[in-house]
UniProtKB/Swiss-Prot annotation:
Signal sequence region: 1-28
Self-association and partners: Forms a tight complex with UGGT1/UGCGL1. Interacts with UGGT2/UGCGL2. Interacts with RDH11.
Organism: Mus musculus
Protein's name according to its UniProt entry: Selenoprotein F
Keyword Transcription in record: no
Biological classification of the source: Eukaryota, Metazoa, Chordata, Craniata, Vertebrata
Family: Belongs to the selenoprotein M/F family.
Gene Ontology cellular component annotations, sorted alphabetically: endoplasmic reticulum lumen
Keyword Lipid metabolism on entry: no
One of the GO biological process terms: 'de novo' post-translational protein folding
SUPFAM superfamilies: Thioredoxin-like (SSF52833)
Keywords in alphabetical order: Endoplasmic reticulum, Selenocysteine, Signal
Function field: May be involved in redox reactions associated with the formation of disulfide bonds. May contribute to the quality control of protein folding in the endoplasmic reticulum. May regulate protein folding by enhancing the catalytic activity of UGGT1/UGCGL1 and UGGT2/UGCGL2.
InterPro entries assigned to the protein according to its UniProt record, in alphabetical order: Sep15/SelM_sf, Sep15_SelM, Sep15_SelM_dom, Thioredoxin-like_sf
Cellular localisation: Endoplasmic reticulum lumen
Gene expressing this chain: Selenof
Length: 162
């Protein structure tokens, strides 16, 4: 074999060293990452700092400094803006490629949110469109990589629950 014994370990070791370097840089500087850098490290641009508090439950405390550098603080006294409704668009034929979105769509959870519509649009990747009081699209978000809990939590913040 050309790679030799243990050759497959080299890329994993390189990745670990890269992540360790990034973690050290963030902890040393206490700096915030740009959203692109956070995405490259595997963190969502919508990451809330309260999510970083959960890392200890999964023995992931070494990720805490990077998580804190990539997260957004929840506004404690800010009034939440509720939207009049939302449309979750997805292609029925592609739904199997997004099992987390599929689990949400096929569950009873969509019925918990006032004004939420599920629309099957041919060829569409999972998209969430938030509607203003006039029924116009106020925000449009790709939920391609969201899990079921993220979709439910986001909708809980943006729509009125029934």
């Amino acid at each position: 074999m050309a790679a030799g014994q243990g050759g497959w370990l080299r890329p994993a070791l390189g990745l670990r060293l890269l992540l360790a370097t990034a973690f050290q840089a963030v902890s040393a500087l206490g700096a915030e990452f740009a959203s692109e850098a956070c995405r490259e490290l595997g963190f969502s641009s919508n990451l809330l700092c309260s999510s970083c508090d959960l890392l200890g439950q999964f023995n992931l405390l070494p990720l805490d400094p990077v998580c804190r550098g990539c997260c957004q603080e929840e506004a404690q006294f800010e009034t939440k803006k509720l939207y009049a409704g939302a449309i979750l668009e997805v292609c029925g034929u592609k739904l199997g490629r997004f099992p987390q979105v599929q689990a949400f769509v096929r569950s009873d959870k969509p019925k918990l949110f006032r004004g939420l519509q599920i629309k099957y649009v041919r060829g569409s990747d999972p998209v969430l469109k938030l509607l203003d009081d006039n029924g116009n699209i106020a925000e449009e978000l790709s939920i391609l990589k969201w899990n079921t809990d993220s979709v439910e939590e986001f909708l809980s913040e943006k729509l009125e629950r029934i």
